[in-house]
């Protein structure tokens, strides 16, 4: 069975992992990093993803960040005259992770388990599945991020324990309470805030820098796009620095200019000031945490371990707040940036059979129901119900001889329908004429293991049935998804073609350089005609490179290669000939010396004693 990869599709960074030799392993990207920035940039029709896109974000306005915050909405990114949905942008990130995994594994990857925040509603989950499909991935399972983290953390734990997973990522916050032991993972409760994450902590620093600079220089940097991008980078770096040190220097020379000349931003930010600026954000995480504890029926003292997930949990004030609430020192044995992807890989291993004896019981984060008379929200499935699940309830008509009923499907916790999230609407028609309250309409909700909802309505009198698989108002039709899949494949082909063209140009440049060097090395040792032929072929290739005509470059490169090969062969032949001549000359010299030795005569001598002479 082919490998199923586990993907943590994050707001700020994404990560991909796979089961290898019974263990979940993070797949590094070609840059050697274990996480990839969830950043997509467009430049002259070319798409850049990850580190390279993040690096040029300052100068390129066509850069998309934190797209996950818009999943399941009607938001569109207008780039170079084309509109992109959040699903399409996310698919570009997924394509990059898919291709990195394929390069690492040496085989095609077509299936994935993708994680989402536990508090994602149905339309956000559906949008994530659609993004996977556009990227050419069959999404085998959608897993809640805290649950995935618990899978990675608890796989080798045999003792029963209750854990609280506190997941503060780049753009979303979740908290889940699970009971685990001996391969059994049961989510007791989950809560969260889809509009809270590390980006918000960056923003309070950015707002502080703008206010301080305006106070000192009277200039509002918030209107300057390039200055804002530099501020964002500096704020993110300062936030990370303050997790390890108590103060950091923010230095942004030439941030802007006015009539008096260039202006520089120089400011020292202390950890205490940062904690003051972000205290309301830390407090916002505690509400859902208390809610999850209440829903699970547990007190803080009954929690055995607190597991921190997401890069933002490195912030000391966050760690202190959760420690004060639970009375437990947070567990530091997992990498908060990688643990979710590792858990997704474990779930993939469960699906392929590589991981055995693991039972995962997740819950639905929000209540589901329909609108009934007077605009009231009537819940059929309460939040924190274990999934998959199915629930039916019988309703009736509100007027005499009512021929049809509109089923308005909602998700949320508010009492009135208008205050909750609409998931979809459908109609059950052809109800036989009858007084109000007589027809019996059975409404059934089904939630699958991905947390995706199906609803059906049935007239028990006629057995007529109507059903709907929820796709949100922002959802994509099958036709739209198919078109986006084709566009994504075409773009992947275009990207591949563009890379091949760049490689061809580089090879051509290298060949021009090699030719010039070869001609110089040959000097006068080659016929003038051959030299001229090589020069002409070289100039032809240079012109093709300047004109940027790929077909001409390819043809001229092949022609020049043949000429250079012939010249190089000559160069080797000459070198061999010279070596032979040198050897031959040495041989002649040796013979001459031997001849001289033949004329030498050995003479006898006798030693004369001076005493004898006397």
From Swiss-Prot:
Q: Which UniProt keywords are given for this protein, alphabetically ordered?
A: ATP-binding, Chaperone, Nucleotide-binding, Phosphoprotein, Stress response
Q: Which family does it belong to?
A: Belongs to the heat shock protein 70 family.
- CDD domains per record: ASKHA_NBD_HSP70_DnaK-like
Q: Give residue spans, biased composition: Acidic residues.
A: 599-614
Q: Which residues in this protein are found as Phosphothreonine?
A: 172
Gene3D superfamilies, sorted: 1.20.1270.10, 3.30.420.40, Actin, Chain A, domain 4, Substrate Binding Domain Of DNAk, Chain A, domain 1
**Protein name, as recorded:** Chaperone protein DnaK
Q: What does this protein do?
A: Acts as a chaperone.
This protein's species is Halalkalibacterium halodurans (strain ATCC BAA-125 / DSM 18197 / FERM 7344 / JCM 9153 / C-125)
Q: Which PANTHER family match?
A: HEAT SHOCK PROTEIN 70KDA
| Listed Low complexity bias regions | 574-583
């Amino acid at each position: 069975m082919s490998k199923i990869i586990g993907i943590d599709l994050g707001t700020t960074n994404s990560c991909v992992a796979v089961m290898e030799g019974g263990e979940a392993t993070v797949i590094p990207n070609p840059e050697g990093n274990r996480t990839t920035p969830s950043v997509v940039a467009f430049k002259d029709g070319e798409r850049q993803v990850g580190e390279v896109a993040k690096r040029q974000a300052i100068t390129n306005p066509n850069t998309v960040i934190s797209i996950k915050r818009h999943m399941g909405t009607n938001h569109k990114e207008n780039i170079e005259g084309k509109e992109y949905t959040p699903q399409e942008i996310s698919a570009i990130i997924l394509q990059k992770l898919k291709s990195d995994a394929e390069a690492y594994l040496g085989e095609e990857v077509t299936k994935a388990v993708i994680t989402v925040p536990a508090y994602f509603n149905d339309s956000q989950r559906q949008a994530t599945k659609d993004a996977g499909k556009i990227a050419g991935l069959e999404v085998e399972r959608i897993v809640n991020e805290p649950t995935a983290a618990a899978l990675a953390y608890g796989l080798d734990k045999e003792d029963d324990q209750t854990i609280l997973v506190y997941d503060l990522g780049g753009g979303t916050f979740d908290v889940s309470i699970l009971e685990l032991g001996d391969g059994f993972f049961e989510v007791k409760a989950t809560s969260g805030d889809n509009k809270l994450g590390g980006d918000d902590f960056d923003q309070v620093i950015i707002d502080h820098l703008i206010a301080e600079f305006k106070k000192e220089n009277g200039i509002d940097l918030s209107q300057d796009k390039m200055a804002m991008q530099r501020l964002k980078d500096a704020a993110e770096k300062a936030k990370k620095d303050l997790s390890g040190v108590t103060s950091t220097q923010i230095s942004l020379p030439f941030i802007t200019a006015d009539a008096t000349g260039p202006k520089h931003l120089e400011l020292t930010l202390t950890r205490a000031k940062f904690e003051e600026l972000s205290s309301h954000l830390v407090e916002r995480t505690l509400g859902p945490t208390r809610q999850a504890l209440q829903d699970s029926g547990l007190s803080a003292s009954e929690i055995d371990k607190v597991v921190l997930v997401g890069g933002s949990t490195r912030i000391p004030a966050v760690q202190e707040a959760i420690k004060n609430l639970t009375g437990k020192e947070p567990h530091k044995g997992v990498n908060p940036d990688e643990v979710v992807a590792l858990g997704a890989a474990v779930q993939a291993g469960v699906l392929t059979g590589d991981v055995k004896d693991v039972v995962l019981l997740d819950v639905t984060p929000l209540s589901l129901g329909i609108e009934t008379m007077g605009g009231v929200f009537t819940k059929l499935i309460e939040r924190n119900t274990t999934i998959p699940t199915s629930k039916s309830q019988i309703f009736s008509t509100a007027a005499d001889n009512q021929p049809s009923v509109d089923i308005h499907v909602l998700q949320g916790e508010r009492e009135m329908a208008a205050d909750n999230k609409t998931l979809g609407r459908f109609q059950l028609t052809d109800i036989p004429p009858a007084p109000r309250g007589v027809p019996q309409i059975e409404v059934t909700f089904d939630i699958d293991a991905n947390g995706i909802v199906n609803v059906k309505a049935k007239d028990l009198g006629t057995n007529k049935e109507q059903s709907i698989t929820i796709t949100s108002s922002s959802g994509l039709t099958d036709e739209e998804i198919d078109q986006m899949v084709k566009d994504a494949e075409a773009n992947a082909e275009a990207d591949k073609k563009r890379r091949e063209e760049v490689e061809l140009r580089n090879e051509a440049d290298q060949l021009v350089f090699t030719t010039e060097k070869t001609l110089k090395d040959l000097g006068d040792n080659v016929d003038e005609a051959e030299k001229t032929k090589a020069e002409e072929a070289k100039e032809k290739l240079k012109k093709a490179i300047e004109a940027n005509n790929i077909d001409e470059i390819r043809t001229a490169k092949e022609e020049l290669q043949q000429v250079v090969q012939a010249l190089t062969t000559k160069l080797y032949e000459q070198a061999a000939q010279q070596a032979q001549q040198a050897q031959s000359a040495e041989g002649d010299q040796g013979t001459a010396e031997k001849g001289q030795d033949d004329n030498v005569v050995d003479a006898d001598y006798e030693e004369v004693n001076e005493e004898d002479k006397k």
